[in-house]
Amino acid sequence: MDEALNENASGSESDASSVASNLHDDEIIPWFFSREEIERNSPSRRDGIDLKTETRLRDSYCTFLEILGERLKVPQVTIATAIFFCHRFFLRQSHAKNDRQTIATVCMLLAGKVEETPVTLEDVIIASYERIHKKDLAGAQRKEVYDQQKELVLIGEELVLSTLNFDLCISHPYKPLVEAIKKYMVEDAKTQLAQFAWNFVNDCLRTTLCLQYQPHHIAAGAILLAAELPTVDLQSYREVLCQEFDITPCQLEDIRGQILELYERIPTSQESKVESSGGVAVVHQPISRDMASTEKCPSSDIEGGSSQVNLSQSDDHSVHDGSRSEGIGEVNSESEAQKNLQDHSVGNIMVEKSDDVGVVQLKKDLQLHQEEVESKQEKDKKSFEKDITKIDLMDEKDLTESEVEDEINKTMQTGRQIFMKVEDPDDNMTVEHSEIRNANNSGVDDELVADTCLINDSDL
C-alpha cells in the first residue's frame, strides 16, 4: 500500500497474536448485533473516529473491493464475501490501527478460497498495488516492491483469520431471494422485480445490515422495497414475506429503511442542465442517491449497461456477468416519498404551460435548485476536510471526498435512465421528459465495476 503500511506491519503482528491469545478454537463469535450496538461499540470510536468518518471509510473499502474484484474477474458472490469479511473484521478492529486497503486485499484473497474461485497471491498483490498506486503501475513488477507487499498481505492474512477466529462461513441473501421470487411472484413481475431486488441486495453490502440480520431477512427487505415500484403491485405479499422469511413487520420495515438511507447519504455531484425543444422542457440530470431512494428505482446500469440474474440457478454461485443492454425504469412521480425528492431533484417541477412561459419558469426554479446544491456541496466539503484533519489515517494518497463519490456513483446500483412524467394542472396535459442520463460517464481511469444479474426471459 503505501509507506504508512510499513508502520502497521509490526503492529499487525502484535495485534494478530493478541487476538489469537484471547480466542479459543472452540469459541463461537456472535456476528449479529443491533445497529445501536455496532455504532456505539465500534473499536474505531475508541480511537477518535466518529460514525460519519467510519461510514466514509466503509464506503471506501467497499468500492476498492468492487474494483479489485472486477480486475481479478471474480464473480459477484466472491466480492460480496470479501466485503462481509471486511465488515466483520472492522467490527472488532479499529480503522485507526489497520490499513483498510491492506485488509481488503487480504479479504479478497480469502474470499477467493472460500467461494472456490481462487486467485493467485501474485495476481491479488499486483492488482491491489496498481489500484492504490495509479502513478506507479510498474512498481508491482519490481521484486523489492512485490516482496514488501507480499509480506504485508501475509501478515494481514494472519490478523484477519485470528480476528474472525477462523470462522469463514458466509451465507448471502441471493439464494433465498431467487427462491422466493420463483415461488411467489407472478410471471409478469418476475423479471423486473427480481432485477431491482437483486440490485438492492448488492447495494446494501455497503451497510452493516449483514451484521444485524440473517441473509433471508435482508432478501425479504429487498423484495419489499422492490415491490414498491410503480409497475409492480405486490404490497399484498407483505404478510407472505413475513411468513416465508420468518421476519416481523417491524424488522422488515427497518431493513427497508436502512437500504433507503444508503441512497440518501450521498448528494448529487453534478449540476443539472435544462434545455427546451418545441415547448417541451428537457431535463438532463444525474441520478442522485435521494432520487434513487424516493423514486425507488435503482438499477445496475453502468455506462448504459445492465446486469442479469439467472433464476434457473438456486445456489450462491449462480451469479454471473450479464450482457449489457439499455435499461429503463419508469418512475411514478406520486410515490410516497415524493416530498423529500423536491430538495434534490428538478424532475418534479410542475410546468405551468407547455410553452415558452413554462420553460422560463422551469429554468428559474432550476437556478434556485442549483444554488442550493452548490451551497450544500460546499458545506459537505468543508465538513469532510475538517474530519480529515482530526485523524491522520486518510493520507494524501487516499481518495478525496469527490473521488469517493465518483467511485460510488460508478459502482452503486442506481438507475441511469428514467422517463419522468409531469402533469399540467391547468390543461390536464402530460409532458414526457426525455431520458435523464448520468453526466458522469467517463469515470476515473476508465475503471468500471462489472455488474451481476438481470434476468433472461428464457430463465422465467
From Swiss-Prot:
InterPro entries from the UniProt entry: Cyclin-like_dom, Cyclin-like_sf, Cyclin/Ssn8, Cyclin_C-dom, Cyclin_N
Compositional bias (Basic and acidic residues): 314-324
CDD domains listed in its UniProt record: CYCLIN_AcCycT_rpt1, CYCLIN_AcCycT_rpt2
GO BP term, pick one: regulation of transcription by RNA polymerase II
Any GO molecular function: cyclin-dependent protein serine/threonine kinase regulator activity
Cell cycle found in the keyword field: yes
A Pfam family recorded for this sequence: Cyclin_N
Signal peptide: none
Record field: compositional bias (Polar residues): 332-345
Span list, region Disordered: 1-20, 285-345
Highest taxon, organism lineage: Eukaryota
Keywords recorded for this protein, A-Z: Cell cycle, Cell division, Cyclin
Family (UniProt): Belongs to the cyclin family. Cyclin T subfamily.
PANTHER family in the record: CYCLIN
Protein name: Cyclin-T1-2
Biological source species: Arabidopsis thaliana (Mouse-ear cress)
Gene: CYCT1-2
